[in-house]
């Protein structure tokens, strides 16, 4: 079974409070989401492998460490996931960015791919799938499936707020994918919104309704 990591860092929790607040405007909301994504990226990359290299400082030769292993790819789930990408790229500027778009089938109510654009070297990368919300888990499950069937092996899922139902859905469908969240909320309401949540992340990011 995959692991669930809840980041309780004071800066993350402080900024998340204002992200939740319904009085926070679009500009500030967008900036806060980006900032929290940066802080979460710092934590999620804590286990990246290192290798020793030889360098020369202005004073002497030295042994130093650089990141080793596979390169990273960031995959936002459209459209709200886009709001987290720049924050991650501030720490990992060389990461490649793909996109996965999903729509809900009106009859089955299940997510269906409508757009998938990934780096050409999928099998050579480790991926972080990002979406501000993990509600029912349907979109996350399908996005991860889309990556796997195209050759991705090592995938992590990162979101700001999750409901227990969404976490369970991802764990059952993808027990090899660890989940990283800023807050685990109480439940989903009858309309599928996370409670207390933050509302519709996409609308709040882009100023739409």
Curated annotation (Swiss-Prot):
Binds 1 Mg(2+) ion per subunit. The magnesium is bound as Mg-PRPP. Uracil binds at residues 194, 199-201. Disulfide bonds: none annotated. Pfam families: UPRTase. It catalyses: UMP + diphosphate = 5-phospho-alpha-D-ribose 1-diphosphate + uracil. Its EC number is 2.4.2.9. GO terms for molecular function: GTP binding; magnesium ion binding; uracil phosphoribosyltransferase activity. It comes from the Bacteria. Pathway: Pyrimidine metabolism; UMP biosynthesis via salvage pathway; UMP from uracil: step 1/1. Allosterically activated by GTP. 5-phospho-alpha-D-ribose 1-diphosphate binds at residues 79, 104, 131-139, 200. Keywords: Allosteric enzyme, Glycosyltransferase, GTP-binding, Magnesium, Nucleotide-binding, Transferase. Its cofactor is Mg(2+). It is an enzyme of class 2 (transferase). InterPro entries: PRibTrfase_dom, PRTase-like, Upp_B, UPRTase/APRTase, Ura_phspho_trans. GO terms for biological process: UMP salvage; uracil salvage. Belongs to the UPRTase family. Catalyzes the conversion of uracil and 5-phospho-alpha-D-ribose 1-diphosphate (PRPP) to UMP and diphosphate. This is Uracil phosphoribosyltransferase. It comes from Anoxybacillus flavithermus (strain DSM 21510 / WK1).
